[in-house]
Regions:
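Phosphate-binding and adjacent anionic-ligand microenvironments
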Residues: 15-207
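Cysteine protease catalytic core and zymogen-processing segment of caspase-like enzymes
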Residues: 1-12
Length: 207
């Protein structure tokens, strides 16, 4: 998926091309990037959802890569805007240099980070007059665990991101353009994906 591609692109720049500099990612993207940041000793900056937040942060920090959950990526020494053609060329170059097909590249990435990542998202409609009630419900929720994982912290940069043990997370946020609430999660355990999402819907009162 697009989050794993983001991880591969960051790995390509840091490991293969020897770049050294910050990574910028939206709050809804993979924690694989945080692990790569720790491994290569580079800062990882997290922004709200949308390239309108990513691009300025890239310029401010001179980041080597910036990206968002929808699969848009931008790169240092290039325009601070999504460029799918360049991203595709970088993936092809990574395949060429390591002589690996995409599935093998992921194995290499997961071997480097020490873990796999499994991601999914659920979109749910709601009556527009219920938005404030949903926000209050999520804001006041105080779960000790989600999906059987201990809650570590809550980030309200854009919506409500519940950071869980092991780098797993659940994000609940509203669409900026339509009456839809989006529930995202990433976990190292594929069997926990649907449970985490269901708990997220329950927290929002939408299950």
């Amino acid at each position: 998926n697009q989050l794993r591609v983001f991880g591969l692109l960051a790995f390509y720049l840091l490991e293969v091309r020897g770049a050294h500099g910050p990574i910028v990612k939206t709050i809804s993207t993979t924690s694989l990037l945080n692990k790569l940041g720790q491994i290569y000793d580079v800062p990882v900056y997290e922004t709200g959802v949308g390239f309108k937040f990513v691009a300025p942060k890239m310029t401010e920090t001179n980041a080597i890569i910036g990206g968002e959950e929808s699969g848009g990526f931008a790169f240092q020494h290039h325009v601070p805007e999504r460029d799918g053609i360049l991203a595709g060329l970088y993936i092809l170059d990574l395949m060429r240099l390591l002589d690996q097909k995409p599935s093998q590249l992921l194995e290499t990435l997961f071997s480097k980070t020490g873990t796999e990542s499994h991601y999914d998202r659920v979109d749910s409609t709601f009556p527009s007059d219920q938005k404030e009630k949903i926000i209050d419900r999520v804001h006041n929720a105080n779960p000790s665990e989600i999906g059987g994982l201990t809650l570590i912290s809550v980030d309200t940069t854009d919506g409500f991101k519940f950071n869980l043990e092991g780098g797993d997370w659940l994000l609940i946020r509203f669409s900026g353009t339509e009456p839809i609430i989006r529930v995202y999660c990433e976990t190292t355990d594929a069997d926990k994906v649907q449970k985490i999402l269901q708990d997220g819907l329950s927290i929002a009162g939408l299950s």
